[in-house]
Regions:
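Surface-exposed interaction/gating patches
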Residues: 134-166, 170-173, 178-181
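Ligand-binding loop in jelly-roll beta-barrel domains
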Residues: 31, 87-112, 203-229
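Short acidic-glycine-tyrosine-enriched beta hairpin
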Residues: 72-88, 188-203
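A short, N-terminal "cap"/entry segment at the start of jelly-roll beta-barrel domains
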Residues: 1-34, 98-152, 234-237
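Extended, compositionally biased flexible segments
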Residues: 49-81
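Conserved short histidine dyad/triad with adjacent acidic residue
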Residues: 19-26, 36-53, 153-169
Length: 237
């Protein structure tokens, strides 16, 4: 489990995201070969440009308001919004202030190409339908094949209080805790998780996110290959 504490600098080869604090939460050094996650906390103003080469980035606005500027177009950013940028594109983040603009970014190789529609580059959580993932869980898709992302799926899920059966997925996933507290059960170990915690779940890893709070736990998930968050490779009785 990694926590999104502040660090300076910007990872990757695409150029600096200046005017911001950047924290790498998950990458190869943490055992994730394909997916990398970082949290960007933008101060008021505009960042420098970042260009993607052979990769794609799925952005999630955790808090704050601003704009995403890509290919001469401006896209408004607000909390609980997903956004999609692909190889060959250059983008900038602008924070109108006065509060921080906090963006959670997952980067992955571009493998199947893209069918991105620039007019649908951003996706509002409030506009997406609620889907079930078991009796006590629900989710909404953000960036997925509906907006032209063929390799990855991004979603926000709600986990009710309590512990569901241990289970596994065929996909490779990074989970980020937006809201709520609980316990991660993974590999025979238990770790406390809360807002800002980031978890890498390799394919077929048996796990459970137990919600120890009184309200729903809200999580951001991004996984490869693209698919259904409700699918299970295994579930205990």
């Amino acid at each position: 489990v990694r926590e999104s504490n502040r660090e300076g600098g910007c990872p990757g080869d695409g150029g600096a995201i200046d005017n911001a604090d950047v924290t790498v939460t998950i990458d190869r050094s943490h055992g994730s070969e394909r997916l990398a996650q970082r949290v960007i906390r933008c101060r008021p103003g505009r960042s420098g440009p970042r260009r993607l080469e052979s990769s794609q980035e799925l952005l999630f606005v955790e808090s704050g308001h601003g704009t995403l500027q890509v290919a001469g177009d401006e896209h408004l950013l607000e909390p609980d919004m997903g956004a999609y940028v692909v190889s060959g594109e250059e983008y900038e983040l602008e924070n109108a202030g006065p509060e921080e603009l906090v963006v959670v970014v997952v980067e992955a190789p571009l493998e199947l190409g893209t069918a991105i529609d620039p007019a649908r580059r951003t996706v509002r959580y409030a506009d997406r339908p609620v889907l079930r993932a078991g009796a006590d869980r629900e989710f909404r898709y953000l960036v997925n094949q509906d907006v032209g992302c063929l390799d990855l799926t991004q979603f926000v899920g709600l986990i009710a209080p309590g512990r569901a059966p241990d289970h596994s997925h065929i996909y490779d996933e990074i989970v980020y805790i937006i809201e709520g507290e609980g316990i991660l059960h993974l590999g025979g170990q238990e770790k406390v998780i809360g807002p800002g915690s980031a978890v890498h779940l390799p394919p077929l890893a048996e796990h459970c996110l137990e919600n120890t709070g009184k309200g729903s736990m809200r999580v951001l998930g991004v996984f490869h290959p693209s698919g259904d968050p409700a699918s299970r490779a295994y579930e205990s009785e």
